[in-house]
Amino acid sequence: DGVKLCDVPSGTWSGHCGSSSKCSQQCKDREHFAYGGACHYQFPSVKCFCKRQC
């Protein structure tokens, strides 16, 4: 069975998220999320979310 991942808002990203690769790298480097992250829309803007095991 695969690992179930949940998105949590990045604690270090500020403002609009325009690059999922940069978001993912920041999640790994600054917040120590092994699975990285991605940009997702959450009203009212696109934000960086990091992925972790649920």
UniProtKB/Swiss-Prot annotation:
One Pfam entry name: Gamma-thionin
GO BP terms, alphabetized: defense response to fungus; killing of cells of another organism
GO-annotated cellular components: extracellular region
Chief localisation class: secreted
Record-annotated disulphide pairs: 6-54, 17-39, 23-48, 27-50
Domain of life from the UniProt record: Eukaryota
Alphabetic keyword roster: Antimicrobial, Disulfide bond, Fungicide, Plant defense, Secreted
InterPro entries for this protein: Defensin_plant, Scorpion_toxin-like, Scorpion_toxin-like_sf
Family: Belongs to the DEFL family.
Role this protein plays: Possesses antifungal activity insensitive to inorganic cations. Causes germ tubes and hyphae to swell and form multiple hyphal buds. Binds to the plasma membrane of the fungus. Has no inhibitory effect on insect gut alpha-amylase.
Name of the protein described by the UniProt record: Defensin-like protein 1
Organism field: Heuchera sanguinea (Coralbells)
